[in-house]
UniProtKB/Swiss-Prot annotation:
Heterodimer of a catalytic subunit (MsrP) and a heme-binding subunit (MsrQ). It comes from Escherichia coli O127:H6 (strain E2348/69 / EPEC). Part of the MsrPQ system that repairs oxidized periplasmic proteins containing methionine sulfoxide residues (Met-O), using respiratory chain electrons. Thus protects these proteins from oxidative-stress damage caused by reactive species of oxygen and chlorine generated by the host defense mechanisms. MsrPQ is essential for the maintenance of envelope integrity under bleach stress, rescuing a wide series of structurally unrelated periplasmic proteins from methionine oxidation, including the primary periplasmic chaperone SurA and the lipoprotein Pal. This is Protein-methionine-sulfoxide reductase heme-binding subunit MsrQ. Belongs to the MsrQ family. The lineage of its organism: Bacteria, Pseudomonadati, Pseudomonadota, Gammaproteobacteria, Enterobacterales. PANTHER family: PROTEIN-METHIONINE-SULFOXIDE REDUCTASE HEME-BINDING SUBUNIT MSRQ. It holds the Pfam family Ferric_reduct. It comes from the Bacteria. GO terms for molecular function: electron transfer activity; FMN binding; heme binding; metal ion binding; oxidoreductase activity, acting on diphenols and related substances as donors. Keywords: Cell inner membrane, Cell membrane, Electron transport, Flavoprotein, FMN, Heme, Iron, Membrane, Metal-binding, Transmembrane, Transmembrane helix, Transport. It is found in: Cell inner membrane. Disulfide bonds: none annotated. HAMAP family: MsrQ. The chain crosses the membrane at residues 45-65, 82-102, 116-136, 153-173, 178-198.
Length: 211
């Protein structure tokens, strides 16, 4: 049985709740002592992990829609991507304001050098910003064939974000490994497309070097 447009609309409502409820919980935890001994680290971890969850969920939609034969499910992908960007922005903001502090934002450059995993996080966020900004149908029409080329960069985020997570933890635990494994699995489901993209980029690079 295929999903109807009405059912997809209700699914979107549920996804909005899934994006909003963690924020409400975080606000409650901050105000009621629900965080651990290092609340700043807990906030950063929670916001980053939630962003990663939405990224993986967005990547899951295409293979799920294909294998379950639910084409309308694709309509939820943009919503999941926007929630991923929202939580990634909260993650970056919590680091900039709570760890560095408003008066020490100039130290960000030094931090990027001493903590390379931060560079991966910043690159991922910039890509997500570009994808969120161009996610509308009007931007899709305006960019034409370049729209898909731009949005293929989500696969780079799917590589960089788990590495950022693994690199940022002092002790490797099962959790970051599980999320990294899920990212690898979701990318593996697209191996033909990724191989085609890689060959195309290699050909373009070769042509430019030959000029």
């Amino acid at each position: 049985m295929r999903l109807t447009a009405k059912q997809v609309t209700w699914l979107k409502v549920c996804l909005h709740l899934a994006g909003l409820l963690p924020f409400l919980w975080l606000v409650w935890a901050i105000n009621h002592g629900g965080l651990g001994a290092d609340p700043v680290k807990d906030i950063q971890h929670f916001t980053g992990l939630t962003a990663l969850k939405f990224l993986l969920a967005a990547l899951l939609i295409t293979p799920l829609a294909r294998y379950a034969k639910q084409p309308l499910l694709i309509r939820t992908r943009r919503l999941l991507g926007l929630w991923c960007f929202a939580w990634a922005t909260l993650h970056l903001t919590s680091y900039a304001l709570l760890e560095l502090g408003v008066n020490n934002l100039a130290l960000l450059g030094k931090e990027l050098i001493t903590r390379p995993y931060l560079t991966l996080g910043i690159i991922s966020w910039v890509i997500l910003l570009a994808l969120a900004f161009t996610s509308t149908q009007s931007m899709q029409r305006k960019l034409g064939k370049h729209w898909q080329q731009l949005h293929n960069f989500v696969y780079l985020v799917a590589i960089l974000a788990p590495i950022h997570y693994l690199w940022s933890v002092k002790i490797i635990s099962p959790q970051p490994l599980i999320y990294a494994g899920l990212a690898v699995l979701l990318l593996a489901l697209r191996y033909k497309k990724l191989l085609s993209l890689f060959n195309r980029l290699r050909k373009q690079a070769h042509n430019k070097l030959s000029l």
